[in-house]
């Protein structure tokens, strides 16, 4: 009974080894991973449950399986961090590793072995094998050297090869993919993403975390200050670019780094990347009759083709003005309680309105920032570079040529792993040049 169990365990191990080293199995895994990645792209990730209930209702127009209950049940709202997706990545990496150890490395070791032929009958298996007239092994070797072959001679037999990098490259392709997956998983489980809407002149810390991994670390040993926020406009009043002037401070308020960021030009600090993503207007500062400065909050109103910011200026209980801003270009419009336009004002100027002197001091903008940490990025970039390089190198043909001399007759033949027609033409050139020398 024990013997049978041992045989069964051995059979299982061999079955798993063959399965994981099978190219078709790896391709199927890759297609499954790609399919779930597409699902993760189609379905919005890391949203609140209310969002999925509103957009993927059970009785909605979506396919009956694609409803919020199934999305929540199978983790399709956070596909890339689910246990089953990470398991698929692990199995795929294991398959590549087993394939490299059981197939690619032994194949490379076989390619490095010198193999000399002794019998002309061995050349019958080669396509394009030939017989060279009137030459010597020395002359043939000299011709092969001009075609960049590595040559080894044993008696009346020559073995040569070139393009060994083409056999080595698939191992690096597999290793690069494994490193790429490791870097991606590292970013998923230990990275985080935060969003902050910060008024100009204010400090902020990392608080509004919108996504994080199981092992994420949120640093709290620094703060950041938005020194200024400005928007550049085109001649047609459309936005050209918006900028945030940011200082990174330590716990004592000492500036550690200072940078002005804009879209596609983030700030880098200790593994964190701060992106410029959005902007808003939160208030306007005014003075009425030289009293203390008042900060009037503004509410954003989204219109079909535009957006405006609206605030109320209360001069007294019965006299209120509505202030409307369209942008940061220091122009505003005042309306009375009836909705009638009173006048346009310029920020930075004083106006006499309803027996009051109102000074419109400044607009208080806020900048939308996204802060990301992804420890796997260096690994991903490095592995992707090696992946592209090794894939390119893998297209180098690995060619082998054998030559023997038997009774003053010279036989030449060879094999290659790709570009068979080109190799046969090269073999013909070697034969012709060797016989003409």
Curated annotation (Swiss-Prot):
Keywords recorded for this protein, A-Z: Chloroplast, Cytochrome c-type biogenesis, Membrane, Plastid, Thylakoid, Transmembrane, Transmembrane helix
Pfam short name (any one): ResB
Transmembrane segments annotated in the record for this chain: 23-43, 82-102, 168-188
Keyword Plastid: yes
Superkingdom field: Eukaryota
Listed InterPro entries: Cyt_c_bgen_Ccs1/CcsB/ResB, ResB-like_domain
Annotated GO biological process: cytochrome complex assembly
Gene Ontology CC terms: chloroplast thylakoid membrane
Compartments where found: Plastid, Chloroplast thylakoid membrane
Membrane topology: Multi-pass membrane protein
Family: Belongs to the Ccs1/CcsB family.
Assembly: May interact with CcsA.
Function of the protein: Required during biogenesis of c-type cytochromes (cytochrome c6 and cytochrome f) at the step of heme attachment.
Name of this chain's protein: Cytochrome c biogenesis protein Ccs1
Organism encoding this protein: Porphyra purpurea (Red seaweed)
Chain's gene name: ccs1
């Amino acid at each position: 009974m024990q013997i049978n169990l041992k045989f069964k365990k051995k059979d299982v191990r061999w079955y798993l080894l063959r399965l994981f080293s099978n190219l078709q199995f790896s391709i199927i895994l890759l297609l499954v991973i790609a399919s779930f990645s597409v699902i993760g792209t189609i379905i919005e990730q890391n949203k609140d449950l209310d969002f999925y209930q509103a957009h993927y209702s059970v009785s909605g127009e979506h396919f009956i399986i694609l409803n919020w209950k199934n999305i929540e049940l199978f983790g399709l709202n956070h596909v890339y961090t689910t246990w089953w997706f990470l398991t698929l990545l692990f199995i795929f990496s294991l398959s590549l590793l087993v394939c490299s150890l059981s197939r690619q490395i032994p194949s490379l070791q076989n390619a490095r072995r010198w193999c000399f032929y002794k019998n002309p009958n061995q050349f019958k298996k080669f396509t394009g094998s030939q017989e060279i007239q009137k030459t010597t092994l020395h002359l043939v070797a000299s011709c092969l050297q001009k075609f960049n072959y590595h040559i080894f001679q044993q008696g009346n037999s020559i073995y040569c090869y070139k393009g060994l990098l083409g056999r080595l490259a698939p191992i690096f392709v597999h290793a690069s993919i494994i490193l790429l997956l490791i870097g991606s998983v590292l970013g998923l489980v230990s990275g985080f993403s935060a969003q902050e809407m910060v008024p100009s002149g204010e400090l902020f810390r990392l608080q509004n975390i919108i996504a994080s991994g199981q092992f994420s670390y949120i640093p709290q040993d620094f703060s950041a200050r938005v020194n200024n926020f400005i928007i550049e406009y085109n001649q047609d009043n459309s936005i050209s670019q918006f900028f945030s002037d940011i200082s990174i401070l330590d716990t004592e308020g000492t500036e550690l780094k200072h940078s002005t960021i804009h879209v596609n030009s983030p700030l880098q600090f200790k593994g964190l990347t701060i992106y410029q993503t959005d902007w808003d207007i939160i208030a306007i500062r005014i003075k009425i009759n030289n009293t203390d400065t008042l900060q009037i909050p503004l509410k954003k109103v989204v219109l079909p083709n535009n957006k405006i910011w609206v605030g109320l200026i209360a001069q007294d209980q019965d006299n209120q003005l509505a202030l409307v801003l369209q942008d940061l270009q220091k122009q505003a419009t005042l309306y009375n309680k009836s909705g009638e336009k009173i006048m346009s004002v310029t920020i930075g100027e004083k106006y006499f309105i309803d027996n009051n002197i109102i000074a419109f001091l400044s607009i208080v903008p806020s900048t939308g920032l996204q802060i990301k940490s992804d420890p796997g990025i260096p690994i991903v970039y490095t592995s992707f570079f090696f992946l592209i390089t090794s894939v390119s190198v893998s297209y180098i043909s690995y060619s082998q040529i054998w030559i023997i001399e038997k009774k003053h007759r010279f036989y030449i033949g060879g094999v290659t792993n790709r570009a068979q027609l080109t190799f046969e033409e090269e073999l013909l050139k070697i034969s012709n040049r060797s016989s003409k020398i």
